[in-house]
């Protein structure tokens, strides 16, 4: 079994009888000598959908669970359910809107490549997005000529309702690359 310092985002763990999916990890290194590094992990309870937060020392042993990952493509919306199709055997995977509310902000019409469904023993657990997504700015203040030298930012809205900070020189219609885990602008898209 791995130690807390070996746990990565996207892994599933068994903690106090609960199945938890690691969503985020913050590493805190204390300044005192001899103090061990603390790992603050944010989880989503796979069964209930509740958010859970725990702290671990780097050498604590954590029980991990092996998950199956299937490559999928967004297919269609059926009422309040979103249907994703398996890329190999066309198995449909249904998610209620509440289950994937955060992920929907990064899913433009037509979907994006690199989406995976996490399953365990045939049970659908979660939807996992790639690290980056290319989206088009639909609403922002007009770009300022000559502003490329400054590091100032402004809010920009995407078609999905996502709002992030972008450099001042960008304007409506520009395609940008967004880093999904940090919800931040990376660069212009090709």
Swiss-Prot record:
SMART domains, per database record: EFP, Elong-fact-P_C
SUPFAM superfamilies assigned to the protein according to its UniProt record, in alphabetical order: Nucleic acid-binding proteins, Translation proteins SH3-like domain
Coiled coil: none
Single annotated GO MF: translation elongation factor activity
Superkingdom of origin: Bacteria
An example Gene Ontology biological process: peptide biosynthetic process
GO CC annotation terms, alphabetical: cytoplasm
Recorded family membership: Belongs to the elongation factor P family.
HAMAP family given in the database record: EFP (MF_00646)
Protein name: Elongation factor P-like protein
Source species: Erwinia tasmaniensis (strain DSM 17950 / CFBP 7177 / CIP 109463 / NCPPB 4357 / Et1/99)
